[in-house]
Amino acid sequence: MIRKYLRWLYAPIMKMIRNRKSHDRILNDTLRLDELGRQLSESQHRVFYLGITQHSNLGDMGQHYCIKKWISKNYPASELIMFEVTTVIDRRFDFFKKLKAIFRPQDVIVFQSGYTTTDLGGYHDEMHRMVIENMPDAHILMMPQTIFFRKEKNRERTAKSYDMAQHMLFLARDMVSFEAAKRMFPHVTVKVFPDIVTTLIGSFDFN
């Protein structure tokens, strides 16, 4: 009851608290790059998994689980380093300056799969563009994507950015997205690959 009548005061205070928590989380996450630079061996191969899921959506959690499993299988000796999308795109703490300081030519960037090459919401497409524009020579694996843009200007912006990538493999999880990707960024290697969650088919026995 008190909250109802003091909502005008309560709401901005709670927003301020949430913003502060977000600020501290992103700052601490970014500062991990400095610590990693001191800890990681120069001979250690690294996989940077960017855009990991931040919420409890079951589909996104399934993608995350399968991607980690795939990385573990295909890069068993590599150091896996993960960051959320909000950390990557935050411009306040020099994320890319810190990342480029420890990133080496043999390292790999892996992007979260799903419905993330789109202008329907979220920050993943912005993250993809920022990474490619800051690190066009990096080896990048774009896990299976669906492509859809409502606005032509957004599609063109993404197409121009993605086509800058010198060493990116873009996996499309449907034929419509595959054809769209080939048109949008003709200099990028594009392949068809089913949703990464399908790799779980046959993995469990429910009898």
List each model region and its residues.
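Helix-loop-beta element that forms the nucleotide-linked donor phosphate-binding surface
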Residues: F178-V197
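Extended, charge-rich low-complexity interaction segments
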Residues: P105, D174-V176
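A short beta-strand/loop micro-motif in the catalytic core of glycosyltransferases
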Residues: G59, H167-R173
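Aromatic- and Gly/Pro-rich donor/ligand-binding loops
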Residues: I2-D163, F193, V197-N207
